[in-house]
From Swiss-Prot:
This is Indole-3-glycerol phosphate synthase. The gene is trpC. It catalyses: 1-(2-carboxyphenylamino)-1-deoxy-D-ribulose 5-phosphate + H(+) = (1S,2R)-1-C-(indol-3-yl)glycerol 3-phosphate + CO2 + H2O. InterPro entries: Aldolase_TIM, Indole-3-glycerol_P_synth, Indole-3-glycerol_P_synth_dom, Indole-3-GlycerolPSynthase_CS, RibuloseP-bd_barrel. Keywords: Amino-acid biosynthesis, Aromatic amino acid biosynthesis, Decarboxylase, Lyase, Tryptophan biosynthesis.
Amino acid sequence: MGTILDKIVEQKKVEVAELYETYSPVKEKRKTHSLVKALEQFTVIAEVKRASPSKGDINLHVDVPKQVKTYEECGAGAVSVLTDGQFFKGSFHDLETARAESNIPLLCKDFIIDKIQIDRAYEAGADLILLIVAALSKEKLNELYNYVLEKGLEAIVEVHDEQELEIAIRLNPHVIGINNRNLKTFEVDLSQTEKLGKRLNEENLLWISESGIHSKEDIIRVKRAGAKGVLVGEALMTSSSISNFFEDCKVNI
């Protein structure tokens, strides 16, 4: 019996095959927006997330333009958009809609296993690509990271444990994302940020904390660990006051 991540990657292989049948990448270059620049101060990457394998439907009928506009008005430094359809009920259309509304960096949040997905994300308006170490061989990670650079985009290289972290450090990527969620079990443990953050601080690398961030106390905790930003989805998608959440993020430590 495979893990949740295994099932997702198998589905991605099907989607990649379909993309090669139905999609022809465009060659035009376009302007992009930098997350690295945004992370010069503590930044919230606010996510458009309709559903997830662990929570089921979160906000299935979200008005993407309105949500993205609210995020930007409240002070988000970037917006993340789930483009996976099978497990998270997102789409590249959501990414395109977000791009039409936003002038801040946009992350394509998906399980990227092939260059053609990066081409599709680029065309949809992404500035940032998520590369998940747990989903890729070292060779494939290197290949896709170099392709992200070739496209003029930035990468968030995502890790969950020490072994994945060492692989990511060797890439010297734009940004490392510590995912507090174990993608094999989907359990969340915020202490991963503290454990792995120490090593990243030693290397003086730019990093953010992802998943399981719901409160002012969580924000304080990840800031103290040295994170330069947080990626927040569920808490914002279910919040009755998005502006209050952003106010909590301004807390000084």
